[in-house]
Amino acid sequence: LGFDRCQVAVVTNIGAGDHLGLNYITTVEDLAVLKRVIVQNVATTGYAVLNAADPIVAAMAPACPGKIIFFASDRHHPVMATHRAQGHRTVYVDGDSIVASEGSWRETIHLRDVPITRNGKIGFQVENVMAAVAAAWGVDMPWQTIRRGLSGFVNDSDNAPGRFNIMDYRGATVIADY
């Protein structure tokens, strides 16, 4: 690592190991060990942002010296429900909104105000936005700043080339993704 401790670490998923075969990472277990390193290096005052719906990622929670913010589309997922019941920070989808909650406190961000999700229709982008919201919250970024960033972010070839860039061309929608 290029740092000793971090205030926020984010692990979005391990899944089926989409990046296997790169840099001697050949198994899902190898990938989990590698991604867990940043969780282990969270400052005691910091947060690990973990996907509650990915069991390998959720299992990283005990390795974090700081606190955990779990995120998942399903707020009723057992990991999410337990974490919420304990009054801890969670980020989830409720209808047409992303909700950040801690105890009885809630902040809501409407998906219609987050262009990258296309009104919540692009599920993996909703997941990415939940992780981004949790990370920004973990460093106490003001909610107005978080909203402004989400509403103004455009996933185009200038800032994220080849990463699910959506373009309209002559009446057709074109997606560039590698």
Region spans (language model):
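Flexible active-site lid/hinge loop adjacent to a nucleotide/diphosphate
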Residues: 1-79, 117
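Adenine nucleotide phosphate-binding catalytic loops in nucleotide-utilizing enzymes
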Residues: 24-32, 36, 65-178
